[in-house]
Curated annotation (Swiss-Prot):
Superkingdom of the organism of origin: Bacteria
Keyword presence, Membrane: no
Biological pathway: Amino-acid biosynthesis; L-homocysteine biosynthesis; L-homocysteine from S-adenosyl-L-homocysteine: step 1/1
Entry's localization field: Cytoplasm
Protein name per its UniProtKB record: Adenosylhomocysteinase
Gene3D superfamilies in the cross-refs: Adenosylhomocysteinase-like (3.40.50.1480), NAD(P)-binding Rossmann-like Domain (3.40.50.720)
Organism (species): Mycobacterium ulcerans (strain Agy99)
Amino acid sequence: MTTTETSLSADTKNGIDFKIADLSLADFGRKELRIAEHEMPGLMSLRREYAEVQPLKGARISGSLHMTVQTAVLIETLTALGAEVRWASCNIFSTQDHAAAAVVVGPHGTPEEPKGVPVFAWKGESLEEYWWCAEQMLTWPDSDKPANMILDDGGDATMLVLRGMQYEKAGVVPPAEEDDSAEWKVFLGLLRSRFETDKGKWTKIAESVKGVTEETTTGVLRLYQFAEAGDLAFPAINVNDSVTKSKFDNKYGTRHSLIDGINRGTDALIGGKKVLICGYGDVGKGCAEAMKGQGARVSVTEIDPINALQAMMEGFDVVTVEDAIGDADIVVTSTGNKDIIMLEHIKAMKDHSILGNIGHFDNEIDMAGLERSGATRTNIKPQVDLWTFGDTGRSIIVLSEGRLLNLGNATGHPSFVMSNSFANQTIAQIELWTKNDEYDNEVYRLPKHLDEKVARIHVEALGGRLTKLTKDQAEYLGVDVEGPYKPDHYRY
């Protein structure tokens, strides 16, 4: 699809509005979804536990999260627990079109008569299309019944509502600056266009929303920034820092999907190659471990001496980008920060070396600088480009245009690890929806006993057998026999 923001319109069938690539892919998507359900014991356990209670009845959840097969299982878990849902992807390349089709058609519908959930997502959206989809996800058919919950990944949905409300109260949407990113210009353009037609839209939504649950590190950072500025208009649960999310999805999911993305994108042998991983947080740890497991010679960049020391204890060299970029065969950014690999670094890379990002946003690699550099871009296949510099003749392989390569070049994290993350998301939605009066407009984390609940489900699914504390042992440790077993400050 190459239409512009102004020419897009939703499709409607059987009372469901949606915009996806191909509704006929639903059968394929449903088959993969059924397989994923067997690999997602956390979500299936929550369906069994809460199906009769319907704890999310009355919730109108606007979800912005990668529209994958695994997310399809999450969406249908939310609806099984009573929620109404509208969905968009949080990345222009991450949608799996057959998964989107399966969700729209639903388990009991057909492409001719869909009975599922409105989805606005397809693989390969433009920036204008992406933000149009985000607005559709937040715009419910009955304006008197707007979204009352947000499920977010990266914070774009939350930002759209909160910035929209902020600008409505100010009476003006600020103009874009010349050096603003292309995406920010599109974002402001959308808000400006909507301000002209509906000056109170975002304020109305913000006042209706009872809470947001946030999936990832960068989105959590945005939440804390909104809270510190006094601009957070509803409670938020930081799902990312649940142990069963950050220590599993971020590390073990990345360990699986990074290799998958590089293999599908390039078919390059990793063993023996020099690899530079920028950032050694939970995601960076998964990246480094994955590359080491393939036989690569791995170096790491870090700003934090504690993380740097951890890397060295694992046998990784800690270097600067400037020191290592010229020798690296593969470079992966995983910092959650901006301006990590700049144009001068890219120009210093070896001929036909591989450059990719696995942080949530596309600002870790200076793609704008690369586009302005005069380098020639040759598309090899979807989300794989060869950039050639005329002055040196050297070429660099860039994956997914600097966006998430594990979702752009592959299919993201495997179902089992996402079952941990999405079980946390579901529990967090239930928590905010059913106990809303217990939360202020601040950022919270799920209590430890719920973290342990998610872990226990998955230990049992893998055939593990947990040791049971005696009453005397529990008293000795100062904990309950049934947990929680660790204080909040325990780092795992």
